[in-house]
Each structure stands twice: as C-alpha cells, then as structure tokens.
C-alpha cells in the first residue's frame, strides 16, 4: 500500500456542488462565496469573515489595511513556513524573527517581549500543527507595552496597541479555553489549501474581532477593495440591472475567492465536524502506540484547556540528528510511506540568510527541526494503513 502524507478528502457532494456552480452561470466571486463567508463567521463565532485566494493574501492585506510598511517592524516565529514572514517583506516592513521556547513550537515569549520596540506594529503568532498558541500570554505582553506603541494609521490608533494577527493556517476548528480559533486574535488568517483539513483547492479566510470606533462593515469593505483592484463594486453587484458604473478607489490587488472554490468549501464545512472527529481518532491511535516507545516524542493535541484541529502529526526522535532523521524518511519511503518535515526554520533558507538571519541565533528552533518527522494524518487514512505506519515507523527507528 502507498500512503501519502495529506491528500485532499473530496467526495461526491463536493463534486456535485462544483458542477452546480458551473451550471449556475456564476463562477467567480458571487453568491456561494458570500454564503461561505457567512458560514465561516458563524462557525468561528465572529461577526464577519472575508474569503480570499490564500491565507497569504489574508495576512498581507491585513498588514496593508493596518498601514504597516517601511520603517515598521513585525514580530513572528523563526519556526514557520515562509508565508508568515514573506508578507512582512511584501509590505516593506522588517521581519523580526523569534526563536522558539526550549522544547516548544511556540515563540519564546520572553524573547518576543524583549524584541518589542517603538517600531513594532504587529505580532504574528503561528498556530502550528493546529494547536492554538498561548494568546493570554501574548495579549498580556502587548497590553503591558502599550506605552511604547506608536500608531501610524487610524486603524492602529483605534486598536491602541500592537496588533495580534494569528497565522492559523493549520488551526481552523481548533479551540483554547473554550474559544474558537478565529475569535481569539485581533485578526485570524486561515488556509484552505489542498493539504489543509478543509480545502477549497487554494483559498483562505480572514476573521477579526470588533474594533472600538471602527464599523465592521467598513472593515469588510476595505478587504473587498484591497482584494479586487480597488473596485467600488464586485462583479456580482455590477451585474444588477442599471448598475454597470463603478469607481477605482485605489490601485489595489487581485486575490478574491471564486464561487467554484467556495462550492467545495461549503460542502467541506458541512462535513467538518466529522472530519475533525476522525482526525482525533487517528491521533489517539498514534498517541497510544507511541506512548510505550520512549524514543518518540509527540505533541499534546488535546488537553483540559485546548483542542487542536489535528492538522499535522509531528514527532521528534530522541538523540537523532538531521542525517539520521533524513535516513529514516528515506527508509519509510522505501516502504511506501510518505512523511514530511515541518518546518525547516526560516534562518536556514536562502531568502532569510540574505536578510541577515543566521540559524546559530535560533538554537531551539533548530533543535525542534533536526529530529522532526511528520507522519501521515488525513481523513482518507484507514485504520489498517495507520497500523502499517505505526509498525514500520517503530521498526525503522529501532534498527
């Protein structure tokens, strides 16, 4: 049997809904996208959501709406995918990378606090693997540093402190302290890429908390303008009889979601609670199997105060370096089991080396990376395949 890491779970209902969208005559941003936005907002317990073509676009447009640019600093983790930091570069701001805490996937919050300056305008925590970060601690830090905050836009001034923008690409459906991811950070970006728990092939969504003195509809409209060339009407509004005329408010960007993408998402969202439950079952099987294996360390996806979305099953192999880790990956592949690594820290990548970052300054992030292997975890994985992964993984590590 060949076992992939994370294929999309697309069934006949998704296919039927896409066909219906194609037959409807409306395939770009339209009624299905608007309905998907409403359902995402309801699911996340927020007032509004906006759907775009990627989580990357969601984060970048948020930074642009905040007025963050050259001369500003944005803090994020060194242990993440490039999208988290690249959007900071896109707007001309300076990324400030923080090492992880010892033995953790989250930023070292003491180092994060010490990195805050008068130029710091936002912090982007990363909810890696689907586990929500400690936002209580993050908010405690940004609230304690209000005195040094220097807003440079009306929205920043209304927020009144450093903005917290969650990179929750992995964490749609996760919870912490009974609060749904999407209703915790000031702004929350989700990914619906093909490998994610809920997919629209490509795509993403953004939710946000109310800002005192700022109308939610105004915020939604700004995201519409930013994502559709600054056009005052979307394609759906322009098709209304006699409503052809529009204005271009600003020379903006093009990153809207289509109704074909939303058609997939609407069905995926109907199935999502069952998909999350299956992921929890699979994680339970892995956890129980590896509990007796003292060389394998795993994440705590579920606890008294949190429930993960179960997006990735990260393992760490004790007393293992990169060379042996990579050899294990090859040997798993020889048995037709695909695995992955999440993530190679950004300071090890050429782009970030060129920005002056050096992995020697991020020893904890490197320690998390050097012996990490991500095992298959997806809702098409059968119990038999899961047992095959477990038995082979333990066998290979033991020899």
Label each region the model flagged:
Residues 16, 60, 109-117, 136, ...:
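Amphipathic, non-transmembrane alpha-helical secondary structure
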Residues 86-88, 180, 260:
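Hydrophobic/aromatic ligand-binding patch that stacks against planar heteroaromatic rings
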Residues 1-26, 31, 247-249, 376:
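N-terminal "arm"/small-domain region of PLP-dependent enzymes with the aminotransferase-like
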């Amino acid at each position: 049997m060949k076992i992939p890491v994370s294929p999309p779970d697309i069934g006949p209902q998704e296919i039927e809904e896409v066909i219906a969208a194609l037959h409807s005559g409306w395939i770009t941003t339209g009624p299905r996208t608007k309905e998907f936005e409403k359902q995402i907002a309801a699911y996340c317990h927020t007032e509004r959501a906006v759907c775009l073509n990627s989580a990357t676009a969601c984060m970048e447009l948020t930074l642009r709406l905040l007025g963050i640019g050259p001369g500003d600093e944005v803090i994020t983790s060194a242990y993440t995918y490039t999208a988290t930091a690249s959007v900071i570069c896109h707007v001309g701001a300076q990324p400030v990378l923080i090492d992880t805490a010892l033995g953790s996937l989250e930023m070292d919050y003491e180092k994060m606090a010490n990195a805050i300056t008068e130029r710091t305008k936002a912090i982007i925590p990363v909810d890696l693997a689907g586990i929500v970060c400690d936002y209580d601690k993050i908010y405690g830090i940004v609230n304690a540093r209000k005195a040094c905050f220097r807003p440079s836009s009306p929205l920043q001034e209304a927020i009144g402190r450093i903005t917290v923008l969650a990179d929750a690409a992995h964490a749609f459906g996760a919870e912490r302290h009974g609060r749904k991811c999407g209703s915790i950070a000031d702004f929350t970006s989700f990914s619906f890429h093909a490998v994610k728990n809920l997919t629209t092939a490509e795509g993403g969504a953004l939710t946000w908390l109310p800002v005192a003195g700022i109308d939610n509809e105004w915020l939604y409209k700004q995201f519409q303008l930013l994502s559709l060339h600054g056009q005052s009407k979307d394609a759906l509004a322009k098709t209304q009889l006699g409503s052809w005329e529009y204005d271009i408010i600003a020379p903006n960007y093009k990153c809207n979601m289509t109704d074909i993408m939303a058609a997939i998402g609407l069905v995926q969202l109907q199935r999502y609670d069952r998909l999350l439950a299956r992921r929890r079952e699979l994680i339970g099987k892995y956890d129980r199997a590896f509990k007796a294996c003292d060389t394998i360390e795993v994440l705590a996806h579920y606890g008294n105060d949190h429930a993960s979305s179960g997006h990735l099953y990260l393992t760490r192999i004790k007393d293992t370096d990169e060379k042996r880790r990579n050899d294990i990956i090859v040997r798993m592949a020889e048995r037709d089991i695909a695995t992955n690594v999440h993530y190679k820290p950004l300071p090890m990548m050429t782009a970030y080396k060129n920005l002056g970052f050096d992995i020697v300054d991020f020893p904890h992030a490197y320690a998390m990376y050097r012996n990490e292997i991500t095992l298959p975890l997806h809702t098409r994985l059968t119990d038999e395949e899961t047992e095959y992964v477990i038995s082979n993984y333990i066998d290979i590590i033991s020899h």
